[in-house]
C-alpha cells in the first residue's frame, strides 16, 4: 500500500520538460487568454537569499490557471512544485504535472497511512529545499472571496521548521493573483446558482467538458471571434 501511495504522489521532475516545453506551452496559452503582469514588493526579491534557502509561495486560489501563471512569471528564477488535486489525475495532465515536478494529493481521503506517507514526502522535499507553491484555501474559490484556510499540508511543510537550522533557511512569500475574468466563470456561476455545491462528475464527463471547451474556443480563434479574458495580475511579496 505504501508503494502504491508513493507511485501516486511522487513526481518525476524533468528539467527539459519544465524549462523548454513548459515555458513554450505556458507562454503560448497565456498569450491567447491573458495579458500577464507581475509586480514585486521589492525590486530584486531573490537577492540576499542563501543558496540553501527553503522558499514556500503562499497563494490565493482564483483559477486553475494559477498554476500556469505563477510558474510562468517565476520561470526565469526558479522552478516551482505544486500540490495538485485529483481533478488532474487524467492522461495527459497527470504525466505533464509530474514531469513538471508537482505531486498529487487526495484532498478528502482520511486514511491514516496515506497521510503519513504524504507528510513524510512533503517534509522530505521541504528539507531538501524544493521550492513549493501552496494554496491555503485548499481549493478553488467559487465567488472570488478568500475561503477559510486549511492547515493540513501547511502543517506538514512548516512542521520541519521545528528544527532551528531549517527554520533559519525557510522563507514564506505571499503571492496575490487576480484576473479580469477567470476561465471557469460559467462553471462557477452555475455552482453558485445551485447553492454553491460542486457536483461530483466522472473523469469521462470532465474529459468531455474539457474537450468541448477546447474545440469551442479553437473555433472562435479560427473564425477570428476570439477576445482575451483580460489581464492576469500577480503580486509577489
Name the predicted role of every residue range:
Residues 105:
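Hydrophobic residues at beta-strand termini and immediately following loops
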Amino acid at each position: 500500500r505504501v508503494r502504491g501511495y508513493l507511485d501516486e504522489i511522487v513526481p518525476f521532475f524533468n528539467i527539459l520538460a519544465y524549462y523548454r516545453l513548459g515555458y513554450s506551452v505556458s507562454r503560448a496559452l497565456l498569450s491567447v487568454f491573458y495579458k500577464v503582469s507581475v509586480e514585486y514588493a521589492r525590486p530584486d526579491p531573490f537577492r540576499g537569499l542563501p543558496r540553501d534557502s527553503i522558499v514556500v509561495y503562499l497563494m490565493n486560489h482564483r483559477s486553475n490557471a494559477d498554476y500556469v501563471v505563477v510558474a510562468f512569471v517565476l520561470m526565469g528564477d526558479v522552478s516551482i512544485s505544486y500540490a495538485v488535486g485529483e481533478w488532474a489525475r487524467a492522461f495527459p495532465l497527470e504525466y505533464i504535472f509530474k514531469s513538471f515536478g508537482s505531486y498529487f494529493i487526495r484532498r478528502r481521503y482520511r486514511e491514516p497511512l496515506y497521510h503519513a506517507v504524504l507528510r513524510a514526502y512533503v517534509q522530505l522535499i521541504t528539507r531538501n529545499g524544493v521550492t513549493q507553491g501552496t494554496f491555503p484555501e485548499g481549493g478553488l474559490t467559487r465567488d472570488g472571496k478568500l475561503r477559510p484556510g486549511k492547515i493540513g499540508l501547511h502543517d506538514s511543510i512548516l512542521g520541519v521548521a521545528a528544527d532551528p537550522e531549517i527554520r533559519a533557511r525557510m522563507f514564506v512569500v505571499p503571492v496575490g493573483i487576480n484576473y479580469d475574468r477567470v476561465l471557469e466563470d460559467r462553471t462557477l456561476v452555475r455552482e453558485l446558482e445551485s447553492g454553491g455545491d460542486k457536483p461530483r462528475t466522472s473523469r469521462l464527463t470532465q474529459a468531455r467538458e474539457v474537450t468541448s471547451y477546447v474545440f469551442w474556443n479553437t473555433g472562435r480563434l479560427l473564425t477570428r471571434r476570439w477576445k482575451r479574458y483580460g489581464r492576469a495580475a500577480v503580486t509577489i511579496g
